[in-house]
């Protein structure tokens, strides 16, 4: 962190040089396959002097809190994809359990004591090497902030509805450095993004799409809106009922736009890109999520829903029973 802070000192005067130095430094110290592949790709992209990612980086460094960028980035890159990945691979090697590098939690914010309900899950996750969590609530996201604060070594991605992003929420979120807020794409997204930008918080937008709602993504209008909102990332997530062909077309468009550096924002597919990172860290990748009642979203190899509940079973036992290498092969 000290090295990164030192490198960021000249960010305001020369963001391009600062970015190149950070990428070169990261590539020099990177050890894992994921790190090396990621930073080699980043350096290749930044060799393009006209890359739209340069003005994106400059805007991000000027308008988002640097301590938040450092903490979230270190938690994601080091704790999650380096230190955590080492634990994930060790458990696979010694216990034959396929541990995901990230998992999703859909949380009902109306519960009176979220800490006692969920902290054990984060503790179990970290023991298994999981330091990256994607949290979603369709209720009040401010209720989740104490949970996020209590896990400062984790990178927390908090997905919420735009109407829930208020001045009070943004003010409460200012004290947290380990969180990126994902704002749902709807009629109020622009207002929510302006609030978060005013408070120098880390944010981006995400969109869940169906077969009939992919046109805006494929045409680029969704990404151009994200540019206007000054979002570092523009994420998509397929609805469970979305057809495989539409998912594949959207992912091809996401990767194509990212590689071509088409927009002043970085397109991400929350399913396929997470799966791809998982396959680099420890193949075969598993994407796991839990509903508000604790039941698991995942489908078994026989096509039937898995009957696990995170509130009744330990995470290790769930993974051992349904996500062991023998079980998946």
Regions found by a protein language model. Name each.
Residues 102-116, 125-142, 151-190, 196-215, ...:
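Core AdoMet radical
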Residues 143-160, 252-256, 262-264:
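Short acidic, glycine/proline-enriched helix-loop-strand junctions
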Residues 144-146, 168-170, 247, 301:
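A short acidic (Asp/Glu
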């Amino acid at each position: 962190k000290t090295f990164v802070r030192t490198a960021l000192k000249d960010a305001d005067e020369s963001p391009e040089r600062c970015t190149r130095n950070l990428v070169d430094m990261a590539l020099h110290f990177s050890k894992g396959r994921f790190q090396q592949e990621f930073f080699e790709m980043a350096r290749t992209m930044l060799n393009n002097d006209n890359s739209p990612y340069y003005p994106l980086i400059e805007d991000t460094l000027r308008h988002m809190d640097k301590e938040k960028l450092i903490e979230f980035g270190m938690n994601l890159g080091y704790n999650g994809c380096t230190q955590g990945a080492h634990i994930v691979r060790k458990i696979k090697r010694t216990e034959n359990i396929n541990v995901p590098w990230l998992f999703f939690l859909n949380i009902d914010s109306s519960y009176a004591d979220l800490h006692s309900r969920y902290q054990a899950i984060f503790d179990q996750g970290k023991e298994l090497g999981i330091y990256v969590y994607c949290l979603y609530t369709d209720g009040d996201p401010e209720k989740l902030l104490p949970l996020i604060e209590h896990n400062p070594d984790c990178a927390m991605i908090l997905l919420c509805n735009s109407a829930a992003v208020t001045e009070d929420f943004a003010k409460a979120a200012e004290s947290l450095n380990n969180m990126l807020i994902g704002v749902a794409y709807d009629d109020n997204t622009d207002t929510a993004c302006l609030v978060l930008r005013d408070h120098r918080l880390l944010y981006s937008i995400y969109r869940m799409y169906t077969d009939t709602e992919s046109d805006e993504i494929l045409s680029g209008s969704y990404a151009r809106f994200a540019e206007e909102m000054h979002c570092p990332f523009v994420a998509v997530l397929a609805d469970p009922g979305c057809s495989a062909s539409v998912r594949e077309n959207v992912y091809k468009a996401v990767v194509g736009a990212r590689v071509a550096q088409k927009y002043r924002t970085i397109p991400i597919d929350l399913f396929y890109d997470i799966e791809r990172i998982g396959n680099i860290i420890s193949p075969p990748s598993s994407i796991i999520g839990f509903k508000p009642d604790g039941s698991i979203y995942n489908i078994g190899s026989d096509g039937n829903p898995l009957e696990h509940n995170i509130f009744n079973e330990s995470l290790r036992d769930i993974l051992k029973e349904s996500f062991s290498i023998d079980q998946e092969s």
